[in-house]
Design a protein with these regions (language model features):
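Conserved, single-site charged/polar hotspot
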Residues: 2-163
Length: 163
């Protein structure tokens, strides 16, 4: 009898310990890093961002530490191009070509936070911040830092058949 009771108690404790975490316990501030390009052939020489028509325009340029954004300059342009010039990231207005921001020489990345909720990049609308990093071949890789809820809202329409 003791043996049966001990086994039952162990089973109950095991099931209780491995129970699933409730959905409300998940951190809604979780940010994902989505590689929009990778080093090598798919990296860019001059990647571009553009505000979605009808949304707020402008951007804030800065850096990231982990997934925390730290802005240093506001830009009012609606379309930006990022290049590596003289060992520094250079942000310019896509339409006029005027230089709007230049990072410190040797900086390994810059981050751009759009003022709008959606931004065009490579023919798709994206939520979140964009981080530009140096690729080993001298070009630029782009990473989208996006909240998990915005990511799921953006991905599901492409992943689920409407029928």
């Amino acid at each position: 009898m003791k043996k049966l009771l001990s086994m039952l108690l162990c089973a109950v404790m095991t099931v209780t310990c491995i129970g699933a975490v409730p959905a409300h316990a998940a951190n809604s501030d979780t940010r994902l890093r989505v590689g929009l390009t990778i080093s090598g052939a798919s990296a860019f020489a001059a990647p571009q961002l553009e505000n979605v028509s009808g949304c707020k325009t402008g951007y804030t340029v800065g850096t990231v530490s982990g997934t925390a954004f730290s802005g240093s300059k506001s830009i009012t342009s609606s379309a930006l191009t990022v290049k590596l010039v003289n060992d520094a990231f250079q942000v310019s207005d896509t339409d006029s070509g005027s230089v709007l921001y230049t990072s410190a020489a040797g900086a390994d990345h810059i981050a751009i936070r759009p003022n709008s909720t959606l931004t065009w990049f490579k023919g798709y609308k994206w939520h979140g911040d964009f981080v530009y990093r140096r690729a080993s071949n001298g070009s630029i890789t782009v990473i989208n830092y996006v909240g998990v809820e915005d990511y799921v809202k953006g991905v599901l329409p492409y992943e689920i058949d409407p029928d």
